[in-house]
Amino acid sequence: MLGKTVLLPLLVLLCHSLASASLVYRGADISSLLIEEKAGIEYKNVNGQTQPLENILKANGVNSVRQRVWVNPSDGSYNLDYNVKLAKRVKAAGMSVYLDLHFSDTWADPSHQTTPRGWSTNDIGTLTWQVYNYTMEVCNTFASNGIDVSIVAIGNEIRNGLLWPLGKPDNYANIANILHSAAFGVKDSTLSPKPKIMIHLDNGWDWSAQKFFYNRVLSSGANLVKSDFDLIGVSYYPFYNPSATLSALTTSLKNLRSTYGKDVLVVETDWPVSCPNPAYAFPSDLKDIPFSVAGQTTFVQRVANIVAQTPGGIGLYYWEPAWVQNAALGSSCADNLMVDWSTRQARTSLSVFATI
């Protein structure tokens, strides 16, 4: 009887430990951090104590940080030097680094994929060499600074292509050649161990869109093959389309894994604490989740469970939880942050990362 009494609590603790560490990557994108700090913003933990944001994240279960990298931004925001500085802090806090290469001087997304200044817009051979050399330069710079990189995404939300006009979706062979060149910029770099290479699309819930892109780019007759990349990343936002259900996300992730054999991650997602005037109806199987701090916890746990229950599902990243100067985060909702924008204090929802 005594043995059973002792064993049962141990089993409970073991099960809890396994449940709280089911995802390999429990992450956040905090690319804006250095810009926020330059504006005088300081962050507080849930107890109101001022601390570096990276330490607050780590204490709440975050183990990886996503960083967007721009090529030649006019003001230096998110350029290579900026990201080396941020990554050194991330590593010092004990978290891994995931670089999100935009291959642009500014935002890259389904509506914007502007080729950097000085890169070719009329010759694909020249452009692919520029992509290869730039990608290798980024990786080599991190290596020379002693910074390990866990993941490199070759493009950001590239369902509609990248590096326009040459990489528009009217020419999937060009897209494939660009991605192949980027992948080998990582592979031929001096980073050791080598990062995992990711392709990242938006609308992760839309299996037909995901399948269309990968089937076209892998059958274009160009250089890209499945062995060029390791991971498939998707964005999953609940406030842009009522069809973005959890059920649809589940189907899409499972199909991506079974069709292409890659590990899968949700690399951008958010949930609002305030959304008085949403531009679109929320998906039907999310309507029971309140727009609140508690709702953020519930939403992240549900998405994380879907990822964890997908064969090869290994990670979730929350997009910009602490960008207090941009609480809407580009959406029609008023506030998607896990840090209070007025007090700069971490909300209790931030601790959800310790549970996924």
UniProtKB/Swiss-Prot annotation:
Q: E.C. number, please?
A: 3.2.1.89
Q: Which GO terms describe its cellular component?
A: extracellular region
The reactions it catalyses are: The enzyme specifically hydrolyzes (1->4)-beta-D-galactosidic linkages in type I arabinogalactans
Leader sequence range is: 1-21
One Pfam match, given by its short name, reads Glyco_hydro_53
Q: Where in the cell is it found?
A: Secreted
Q: What is its main location?
A: secreted
Q: Which UniProt keywords apply?
A: Carbohydrate metabolism, Cell wall biogenesis/degradation, Glycoprotein, Glycosidase, Hydrolase, Polysaccharide degradation, Secreted, Signal
User: What biological process terms from GO does the record include?
Assistant: cell wall organization; pectin catabolic process
Q: Which GO terms describe its molecular function?
A: arabinogalactan endo-1,4-beta-galactosidase activity; glucosidase activity
Top enzyme class: hydrolase
- In this protein, the residues bearing a glycan are 133
Q: Which residues cross the membrane?
A: none
List the active site. Answer: 157 (proton donor), 268 (nucleophile)
Q: Which PANTHER family match?
A: ARABINOGALACTAN ENDO-BETA-1,4-GALACTANASE A
This chain's function reads: Endogalactanase involved in the degradation of plant cell wall polysaccharides, and more particularly of hairy regions of pectin.
| Family according to the record | Belongs to the glycosyl hydrolase 53 family.
State the protein's name. Answer: Probable arabinogalactan endo-beta-1,4-galactanase A
Organism per entry: Aspergillus fumigatus (strain ATCC MYA-4609 / CBS 101355 / FGSC A1100 / Af293) (Neosartorya fumigata)
